Structures are given as structure tokens and as C-alpha cells.
């Protein structure tokens, strides 16, 4: 019996990850309420102080369990994204300078492009790849502003990526799907905990890596199209703000999901 089997039944690991995440968050919530309480402001979608940083449990459970259900690119991909989670956690605790955050995002993008065994990009396309990956990281972070939105979308996207060839790929991604599901039980409206930068930036990089891992361009484009409701909102909002001469990274309430919520839609209906 090997520690890292070539394949494993994904459902058991999915359920285990969901249960572990739910239980660990139950234990961690009192600490987060003392140390990482997000106070509502004019740009917030929530109306009462809510702890953030719960994504740290998703990162830990989904990453640690992945190798036990199949060793391969999908199981070591989360480890490549851990530096972003660490910087995101520090940023949740105390605001980091933007330069540090973007530097780690850039380095993570470089690592993903160099390490993932996908079709190598021509050298002249590398800058475009770096921009695309860092954009996805930030887009997922931008969209983490409504109860259950990013967590539920990422469940669908990671599960869709697991449908690729080879049973180990599906099994290796099962813990991340389960961890997201366990987190969603706490994050669904009215949310008792937010993901925080520790979770959203990690998941953005993870999704970018999963796109790069697709065996052919058709599957990669299909995965991107599945993410369009999430990433498209952020993309077009950035374009509008650039056209208006506004600062892209300044907090605002101009995303489609924010406008729908302001128009009276509930968090659950928008999600």
C-alpha cells in the first residue's frame, strides 16, 4: 500500500474534506471574531461585523489532503499557490503594501508558467501569460464581496476541471471541492465568516493553474467560459474604470453583483 495512490475514490475524500473544514471553522471562528473582524462600511455588502480569513481552512484542508488521493499535477498545484495564501493571510491581519502583494502574485504566475507541464508558451507570449494569471488572481479577489459567491463558483469550476482525463486528476481535486463545500456552509447568506484574501487569491491562482493543466486548448477555453459569469464581471468592470480614468484597485460598488444587490436582490439570488 502506497502513501500516494495512483487513484482513489473521490467521494470519500470530498466528504472528509467538507467535514474537516466545517469542524475546523467551528473551532476557529471565536479566534477570527477576536482578531479578524470585518467592520461594514459604505462599500460593504454586509451590515454587521463579520470575521474574515476563513479561507485559511479551505487552503489547508484542500492542499494537505490532495496528495493522499492521487499524486500528480492536480495534487501538487495547490502547493505552488501557498505563498499567495500566506501573503493573503498577513494582508488580512494587517494591510500589506500593494507592491508586496503584486510581487508575490507575479512570482506565482512565473512559477505556474514554468512548472506546469502544459504546452510551452513562445517566449513572446510569456508576458501575456503573466498578465493573464495575475489578472485572474485579482479578478477572483475582486469578486469576493458577496455571501457564497466565490465559494460556490469555485466549487463548480474545480469540479469541472476534475472531469479531465485520468481518475487521479478527479480524485486529487476532490478535497478542494469538499473544503469549499464545507466552507460554503458557513459562508452562505447570512455569512458567518468571509474567505478573506488568504482564500480568494489562492483560489484565483489555483484556477489559473487548472486552466494551464488542461490537455488541449479546447478544454482550457471551455473552463474559462465556465468561469465567465465570475471573471467577466470583474473584467468588464476594470475596462469601464480604465476608460473613465479611475483607479482600478480602489474599492467601489460598481460590479454587476453589487448593482444587483443594491437593486434589492438577496445575496442568495445574486449567487
Task: Please name every model-derived segment.
Residues 2-235:
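"…together with the soluble PPM/PP2C metallo-phosphatase catalytic core" -> "…together
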Residues 43-46, 262-271:
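Membrane-interface alpha-helices at helix entry/exit sites of multi-pass transporters
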Residues 55, 226-263, 267:
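Membrane-proximal soluble regions of multi-pass membrane proteins
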Amino acid at each position: 500500500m502506497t502513501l500516494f495512490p495512483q487513484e482513489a475514490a473521490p467521494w470519500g475524500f470530498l466528504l472528509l474534506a467538507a467535514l474537516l473544514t466545517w469542524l475546523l471553522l467551528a473551532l476557529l471562528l471565536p479566534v477570527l471574531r477576536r482578531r479578524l473582524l470585518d467592520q461594514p462600511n459604505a462599500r460593504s455588502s454586509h451590515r454587521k461585523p463579520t470575521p474574515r480569513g476563513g479561507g485559511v481552512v479551505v487552503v489547508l484542508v484542500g492542499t494537505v489532503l490532495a496528495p493522499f488521493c492521487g499524486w500528480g499535477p492536480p495534487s501538487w498545484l495547490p502547493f505552488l499557490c501557498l505563498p499567495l495564501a500566506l501573503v493573503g493571510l498577513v494582508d488580512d491581519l494587517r494591510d500589506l503594501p500593494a507592491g508586496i502583494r503584486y510581487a508575490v502574485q507575479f512570482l506565482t504566475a512565473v512559477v505556474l508558467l514554468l512548472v506546469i507541464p502544459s504546452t510551452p508558451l513562445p517566449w513572446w507570449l510569456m508576458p501575456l501569460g503573466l498578465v493573464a494569471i495575475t489578472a485572474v488572481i485579482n479578478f477572483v479577489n475582486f469578486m469576493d464581496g458577496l455571501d457564497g459567491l466565490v465559494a460556490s463558483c469555485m466549487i463548480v469550476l474545480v469540479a469541472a476541471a476534475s472531469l479531465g482525463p485520468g481518475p487521479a486528476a478527479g480524485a486529487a481535486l476532490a478535497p478542494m471541492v469538499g473544503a469549499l463545500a464545507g466552507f460554503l456552509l458557513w459562508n452562505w447568506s447570512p455569512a458567518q465568516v468571509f474567505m478573506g484574501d488568504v482564500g480568494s487569491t489562492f483560489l484565483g491562482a489555483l484556477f489559473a493553474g487548472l486552466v494551464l493543466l488542461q490537455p488541449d486548448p479546447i478544454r482550457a477555453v471551455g473552463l474559462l467560459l465556465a468561469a465567465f459569469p465570475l471573471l467577466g464581471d470583474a473584467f468588464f468592470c476594470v475596462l469601464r474604470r480604465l476608460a473613465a480614468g479611475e483607479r482600478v484597485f480602489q474599492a467601489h460598488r460598481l460590479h454587476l453583483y453589487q448593482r444587483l444587490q443594491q437593486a434589492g436582490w438577496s445575496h442568495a439570488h445574486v449567487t
